[in-house]
Amino acid sequence: MKRTYQPSKLVRKRRHGFRARMATRNGRKIIAARRNHGRQRLSA
């Protein structure tokens, strides 16, 4: 059986990257929430 996590840097960036987050309103809310929480890393 194939495992569910098949790492790919490109897919990771496209799905969870900063620009992907900024592209939608809800994504911007995620970035804002992580900024308010004081996260070192805002996105993948």
From Swiss-Prot:
One of its GO terms (molecular function) is structural constituent of ribosome. Keywords: Ribonucleoprotein, Ribosomal protein. The keyword tRNA-binding does not apply. The keyword Disulfide bond does not apply. One of its GO terms (cellular component) is ribonucleoprotein complex. It comes from the Bacteria. GO terms for biological process: translation. Belongs to the bacterial ribosomal protein bL34 family. PANTHER family: LARGE RIBOSOMAL SUBUNIT PROTEIN BL34M, MITOCHONDRIAL RIBOSOMAL PROTEIN 34 FAMILY MEMBER. This is Large ribosomal subunit protein bL34. It comes from Xanthobacter autotrophicus (strain ATCC BAA-1158 / Py2). The lineage of its organism: Bacteria, Pseudomonadati, Pseudomonadota, Alphaproteobacteria, Hyphomicrobiales. The gene is rpmH.
